[in-house]
Curated annotation (Swiss-Prot):
pH dependence per the UniProt record: Optimum pH is 7.5.
EC supergroup of this enzyme: transferase
Gene coding for it: PiNMT
Record note on quaternary structure: Homodimer.
Listed name of the protein: Picrinine-N-methytransferase
Pfam families: Methyltransf_11
InterPro entries according to UniProt: Erg6_SMT_methyltransf (IPR050447), Methyltransf_11 (IPR013216), MTs_g-TMT (IPR025774), SAM-dependent_MTases_sf (IPR029063)
Organism: Rauvolfia serpentina (Serpentine wood)
Keyword terms: Alkaloid metabolism, Membrane, Methyltransferase, S-adenosyl-L-methionine, Transferase, Vacuole
């Protein structure tokens, strides 16, 4: 395992338990109406809504004859997306993550919810997944690709394991799209993004235009992208408020150590970068060609 991948695995092995108060069995941001005041009581509904909005964006059908029969969640965290989709559609879901601790947690949640026959989880490398070509009717990833250095290979691997006609969904942090006259981000923008990435073990962030560019030569169709930045920013004040109470700070420190505290410190930078228009949160989807 490459050094960077090992660092990501250790980060999640050590800090996963710190975030359950905010996310439950999910490890991704929530989806809010712009301008909403986020609350702890509503955070669980918001993270589930993020999944549903992504599925809706990808035009996943509720029709029993058209809905997918199998799903792969790449970078599955502690299993929340698989568990939700398995319950929502009654289908078989598989998750893959680089963290053995996350697999252990995910399997525990599956057993608690009586879904151990519907979902399963593997420890593995997203750049070299142990699945045959064309295996899954839906391939999904949320807030995972940011950790990956070779994002283009990650996308090729998602397309490889998708069945013909399968929707492919990418939800992630990104940077703003460049204007036609720009060759790169401004130096000060790069500096801010590097600080954010270093604090939360992200490799780097690309733009939604990069995702579209990498997908275009592959055997996919109906590529589209959306900017959901305004739908996640309501969560930033909530996390900072709760994390900097004595109870919140000590809980994060005890359950997640310094890794968890660094994430909270990064959130302050993320909020400002989003306000400045540098940091984005995007959804990209397409379908594997038949």
């Amino acid at each position: 395992m490459a050094e960077k991948q090992q660092a990501v695995a250790e980060f999640y092995d050590n800090s996963t338990g710190a975030w359950e108060v905010f996310f439950g069995d999910h490890l991704h941001d929530g989806f809010y109406d712009p301008g909403t005041t986020a609350t702890i009581a509503g955070s669980r509904a918001a993270v589930v809504r993020m999944i549903d909005e992504a599925l809706r964006f990808a035009n996943i059908s509720d029709d029993p004859a058209k809905k997918p029969k199998t799903m792969l969640d790449v970078g599955c965290g502690i299993g929340g997306t698989c568990l939700h989709v398995a319950k929502k559609y009654g289908i078989q879901c598989k998750g893959i993550t680089i963290s053995s601790e996350q697999v252990k947690c995910a399997q525990g949640f599956a057993e608690e919810q009586g879904l151990e026959k519907k979902v399963s989880f593997d420890v593995g490398d997203a750049l070299d997944m142990p699945y045959k070509d064309g295996t899954f009717d839906l391939v999904f990833t949320i807030q995972c690709i940011e950790h990956i250095q070779d994002k283009e290979k990650f996308i090729r691997e998602m397309v490889r394991v998708a069945a013909p006609g399968a929707p492919i969904v990418i939800v992630s942090y990104a940077h703003r799209n460049l204007s036609p006259s720009e060759g790169s981000l401004k130096p000060e923008e790069k500096k801010v993004l590097k600080k954010i990435c270093d604090n939360i073990v992200l490799s780097w962030v690309c733009s939604s235009a990069d995702y579209v560019r990498w997908l275009t030569p592959l055997p996919v169709e109906d590529i589209k992208a959306a900017d959901w930045t305004q739908n996640i920013t309501p969560f930033y004040p909530l996390l900072m408020k709760e994390a900097f109470t004595w109870k919140g700070f000590t809980s994060l420190l005890m359950k997640g150590g310094w890794s968890a505290i660094k994430v909270v410190l990064a959130v302050r930078m993320m909020a400002k970068a989003a306000d400045d228009g540098v940091l984005k949160f995007v959804a990209v989807t397409c379908r594997k060609s038949k």
